[in-house]
Amino acid sequence: MEKSLQLEIVTPDKVVLSEQVDYVGAPGYEGEFGVLPNHIPFLSALSIGSLYYKAGGKTRYAFVSGGFAEVSDNKVTILAESAERAEDIDIERARKAQQRAEERLKAEREKIDATRAEAALKRALARLQVRNAA
């Protein structure tokens, strides 16, 4: 039996991460799920949030913004709309995005797309959470 699995995080622009890991925890659409080596195959929609993985006794974090996770043959493939490793997150940029989203939500509701503003706020908060966890 395998003792590790391959984790790949891919966006439309690039491969964010490709690494052998011991465990993956991801923000599924219906709630967080975890994957250990030799897990049964499955496919899950992802929500905006924190993905974490363990390798060599260390826990590392990444931000994912929606997409899908595929688990098959000791490989976890994350196909995300956007993703960043914790160490690559620009805290100042995330804080500014949070501030812009909060200001849009406070504006008159008729003049904004509240759903888009809420999603932007959720992305900014998740990025900050991931960066602070690292």
From Swiss-Prot:
Main location: membrane
Membrane topology, record value: Peripheral membrane protein
Keywords tagged on the record: ATP synthesis, Cell inner membrane, Cell membrane, CF(1), Hydrogen ion transport, Ion transport, Membrane, Transport
CC terms in the record's Gene Ontology section: plasma membrane; proton-transporting ATP synthase complex
Record flagged with keyword Membrane: yes
An example Gene Ontology molecular-function term: proton-transporting ATP synthase activity, rotational mechanism
Family per similarity comment: Belongs to the ATPase epsilon chain family.
Job of this protein: Produces ATP from ADP in the presence of a proton gradient across the membrane.
The protein, known as: ATP synthase epsilon chain
